[in-house]
Amino acid sequence: MLRIAGRKLSSSAAARSSSAFFTRNPFTFTDDSSSPTRSPSPTSLASQFLDQFRGFSSNSVSPAHQTGLVSDLPATVAAIKNPSSKIVYDDSNHERYPPGDPSKRAFAYFVLTGGRFVYASLVRLLILKFVLSMSASKDVLALASLEVDLSSIEPGTTVTVKWRGKPVFIRRRTDEDINLANSVDLGSLRDPQQDAERVKNPEWLVVIGVCTHLGCIPLPNAGDFGGWFCPCHGSHYDISGRIRKGPAPYNLEVPTYSFMEENKLLIG
């Protein structure tokens, strides 16, 4: 009886498999030639193969908690044994490290504070170096001022010195020169200015020897007023360096100067 039941089960299973094959098989046969009425196209076969492959690949790269294949393995081991393009997160690993030693934290704070202090000091030095590099050098400062010895200048004479690339006239005036400079009517001057405003010591007159017209150098002890005469365009200056005649619009410029001693003059 058991053998007969087994044979019946095997025959029914074979019948179901054959019927399923003919159901899925795209080929149909006719009674006359027993040949298929149509042949499968390569594109249909390729599409069916790709569908099966995609389904297999999607199932193979599904997350670990869905497949259950590597549920008992760590995330790293599961990723090696079951390669997947999806990112699998290990939600079970929440290890927390204990806080560090207080002495080590204090040392770390000390190192960081020291590093910041050194960094700030270096930045400060760089800024100071940059600012100091923009200031004038000692040579330039030396040329900016000029010290002149007045002891060798005789009364009534004029000495020319060079300061900042320009000639400077230093005249030691006599009493007659001083009285003549103070007797001039300011209303008659083109650039009105009293003699006391142009000198710090009435005996000494210090002016820049450049004509205010076009920058020529006037000649001392010349002209119609006993001061300076510009040969370029005929400008006349008096004994105080004021313009009295000619095209020059202004008086000779007075530089910044001071008396260091009785016979020492510092220009600049």
From Swiss-Prot:
PROSITE patterns referenced in this protein's UniProt entry, alphabetically: RIESKE
Disulfide bonds: C216-C232
Cofactor(s) the protein requires to work: [2Fe-2S] cluster
Membrane topology annotation: Single-pass membrane protein
Superkingdom assignment: Eukaryota
Entry keywords, A to Z: 2Fe-2S, Disulfide bond, Electron transport, Iron, Iron-sulfur, Membrane, Metal-binding, Mitochondrion, Mitochondrion inner membrane, Respiratory chain, Transit peptide, Translocase, Transmembrane, Transmembrane helix, Transport
EC assignment: 7.1.1.8
Positions bound to [2Fe-2S] cluster: C211, H213, C230, H233
GO BP annotations, alphabetical order: mitochondrial electron transport, ubiquinol to cytochrome c
GO molecular function, one term: 2 iron, 2 sulfur cluster binding
Pfam families membership: Rieske (PF00355), UCR_TM (PF02921)
Residue ranges of the TM segments: 106-128
Tissue specificity comment: High levels are seen in the flowers while a low level expression is seen in the roots, leaves and stems.
Location, primary (coarse class): mitochondrion
Cofactor binding remark: Binds 1 [2Fe-2S] cluster per subunit.
Residue spans, topological domain Mitochondrial intermembrane: 129-268
Record-linked InterPro entries: Rieske_2Fe-2S, Rieske_2Fe-2S_sf, Rieske_Fe-S_prot, Rieske_Fe-S_prot_C, Rieske_TM, Ubiquinol_cyt_c_Rdtase_Fe-S-su
Enzyme class name: translocase
SUBUNIT field: Component of the ubiquinol-cytochrome c oxidoreductase (cytochrome b-c1 complex, complex III, CIII), a multisubunit enzyme composed of 3 respiratory subunits cytochrome b, cytochrome c1 and Rieske protein, 2 core protein subunits, and several low-molecular weight protein subunits. The complex exists as an obligatory dimer and forms supercomplexes (SCs) in the inner mitochondrial membrane with cytochrome c oxidase (complex IV, CIV).
Protein known as: Cytochrome b-c1 complex subunit Rieske-5, mitochondrial
Source species of the chain: Nicotiana tabacum (Common tobacco)
